[in-house]
Amino acid sequence: MKKILILLLIAASVPSFSQNSIWLEKGKGDALVVAEFKHTPNDSIFNYIYVESDFSKHNDTRSTYVLISRDQKWWKAPVWVHGEIRTFVGKNFTMDNVFLIGPMFELTGGKLGFINLQTMYRYDGKSNFQITFLSDVEYGRFLYSMYADLYGSDRLYMHSENRFFFKVIPHIRIGANLVLTNGEISEDFDFKPMAVLRIDL
């Protein structure tokens, strides 16, 4: 409950962001609280902040994940300079950081949403690469939001989250998050469905 209140206070203290939301996600053995802050590119120091806190009892390795990103361009072409920092904070306040930078290509965009592709240099203690697909599509009461990371480290990894939302009333959405992960690209995929309650602030 304390983590939920902390994230609500964070959301209330970031009025400059144009889209703020809090999510509660629950799956088998998992319980997450997520805060998301979005802003129009070029209009703020950071365009996107994502904070995910895991308060499930089984998690003894990592408690909080933070992603901060910035998109910038000085031309009309649909290509952005994209940079981000990802931080994993353990329960004993141990920290692992990942730094990414590279071009973000706007594959399609319009009133319904967008599809973007990021091809980035990745540094997590050693130099490597990462490819990320992003998409947000909203039609009526329905919203589909996804991202998929394919990256190298000591081997090839993949992580994808697909969120489906239905707007029940203004500011309240319910839905599901389908998480697909592979620790090594040749191994079997781990599929994890989660129920989601989203509050748009």
Placement of each model-derived feature along the sequence:
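Short glycine/proline- and aromatic-enriched beta-strand/turn motifs that initiate or cap beta-hairpins
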Residues: 17-59, 63-65
